[in-house]
Amino acid sequence: MTYFKQIEKINYEGVQSGNRFAFRHYNPEEVVLGKSMKEHLRFAVAYWHTMTQDGSDPFGAATNVRDVSGKTEMELARNRVEMFFEILEKLGVEYFCFHDVDIAPEGNSLQEFMRNLDEITDLIQDKMKQTGIKLLWNTANLFTHPRFLNGAASTNNADVYAFSAAQIKKGLDISKKLGGKNYVFWGGREGYESLLNTDMEFEQANMARMYKMAIRYANEIEHEVQFLIEPKPKEPTKHQYDFDAATTMAFLQKYGLENDFKLNLEANHATLAGHTFEHELNVARTYNALGSIDANQGDLLLGWDTDEFPTNIYDTTLTMYEILQNGGIAPGGINFDAKVRRTSFEMEDLLLAHIAGMDTYARGLKAAAKLTEDHFFDKIKEERYRSFKKGIGARILDNQEDFKSLTEYALAHDSIQNESSHIEYVKSRLNDYLV
């Protein structure tokens, strides 16, 4: 069955195109800094928002019109796979991501859930072979079912801990089966609502124990996969242990996991943590831990995870600049963890929204490439820190100074002159690259 009969494959037509179903900026084969756009951007579509989100919210019923159905839950799951791969092919996107519960019903037992996953991943595997589309990452949903109300790896219930381990094990089996290059952990319920009844050290140690089991199991089945943790400060849990990039790196370092994990960073999660997305990316780069990103944007006027499609060129420019400075994002990618607005309820909006996001990231890439070629930020930073290039500054960096010698220097040079940062000019010049 064809779900988008009236829509042809989305092609690049240029900025003058009036065709809604065409890329105006994303030209997959266009070479930027020696690589094609599709190599730089490594776009992926998220199964959950694309196939299971229905447009409902806490105040209103579902609005999304989706021409996919089934007489049983499994028939619906199979039909969703067909529709999903049609979307990927229409967009020319080469990667996808999913949670286990996105693709198959849980049934009445863990055993039934695993059988359902086997059947659906057989179908997905066939579609991957037919299309050449690849799995960017998968993960286990350890937050929706009521059993996870007190967490999965951080739970106070040993039976829940065992169930969670079984679900992760199956996720890694599926990752190997489908050739996944990354596996994600997002701890939506790994945290606390009150410290009054929480042993934080115990819970975090159990989380680390679970991660180490995952590493060992991946080695046992000879599956080379990049493990990723996705930070988020809150929602659904009041305080989540993977609050932001820096907090997550502190956790990984404490438990000796920093060489086994990188970060999957999401723009809207950065907003909730009180950071810009480029801040989180820069922190991850500092730790050599930038693994993959979830592309979306939040609303600064709202206090929750709105998961909007990215349309802000300023943000995507600074995002792509960090990725270029990182030497790229592979084997990770740019996954659109974004959902259409409740008012964008038609089937075609799924394609239009992804086109908007892909075009916005393409514009960000081109602007970031120009910033890189011009050494725009490099020159500014070189000038700003030039006092450390010679004299006392150079000696400090060479570890030739100590408190005594620096005190002697300060006493002899106590008339200090600072220089203006001219930051308004810098921001204005940055705008020149965003055309």
From Swiss-Prot:
It is found in: Cytoplasm. Its cofactor is Mg(2+). Its main location: cytoplasm. It catalyses: alpha-D-xylose = alpha-D-xylulofuranose. The active site is at residues 99, 102. GO terms for cellular component: cytoplasm. Mg(2+) 1 binds at residues 230, 266, 294, 337. Binds 2 magnesium ions per subunit. Its EC number is 5.3.1.5. GO terms for biological process: D-xylose metabolic process. Keywords: Carbohydrate metabolism, Cytoplasm, Isomerase, Magnesium, Metal-binding, Xylose metabolism. Pfam families: AP_endonuc_2. It comes from the Bacteria. It is an enzyme of class 5 (isomerase). Mg(2+) 2 binds at residues 266, 269, 305, 307. InterPro entries: Xyl_isomerase-like_sf, Xyl_isomerase-like_TIM-brl, Xylose_isom_bac, Xylose_isomerase. The keyword Cytoplasm applies. One of its GO terms (molecular function) is xylose isomerase activity. The keyword Phosphoprotein does not apply. Belongs to the xylose isomerase family. NCBIfam families: PRK05474.1, xylose_isom_A. Homotetramer. This is Xylose isomerase.
